[in-house]
From Swiss-Prot:
Listed transmembrane segments: 6-26, 30-50
Organism: Polaromonas naphthalenivorans (strain CJ2)
Subcellular localization: Cell membrane
HAMAP family xref list: UPF0391
Transmembrane keyword on record: yes
One Pfam family matching this protein: DUF1328
Membrane topology: Multi-pass membrane protein
Source domain of life: Bacteria
Keyword set, alphabetical order: Cell membrane, Membrane, Transmembrane, Transmembrane helix
Protein name in UniProt: UPF0391 membrane protein Pnap_0920
One annotated Gene Ontology cellular component of this protein: plasma membrane
Entry similarity comment: Belongs to the UPF0391 family.
InterPro entries: DUF1328
C-alpha cells in the first residue's frame, strides 16, 4: 500500500509541474484537478498503510 502512496505522490507532482508551471497552458484546469485528486489519493493510501501496519 505504501507503494501506491509513492506512485500517487509522483503523479500528483507531475500534474502540479504541468498545471502550475504553465507548461501545458491548454490543460491547466485538468492538471490542477489531477494534482489534487492524486494528492488526496496519496494521503489516503498512506494513512491506510499506517493503519494496516499496526
Amino acid at each position: 500500500m505504501l507503494h501506491y502512496s509513492v506512485v500517487f505522490l509522483v503523479i500528483a507532482l507531475i500534474a502540479a509541474v504541468f498545471g502550475f508551471g504553465g507548461i501545458a497552458a491548454g490543460a491547466v484546469e485538468i492538471a490542477k484537478i489531477l494534482f489534487f485528486l492524486f494528492a488526496i489519493m496519496a494521503i489516503v493510501s498512506f494513512v491506510v498503510s499506517l493503519i494496516k501496519k499496526n
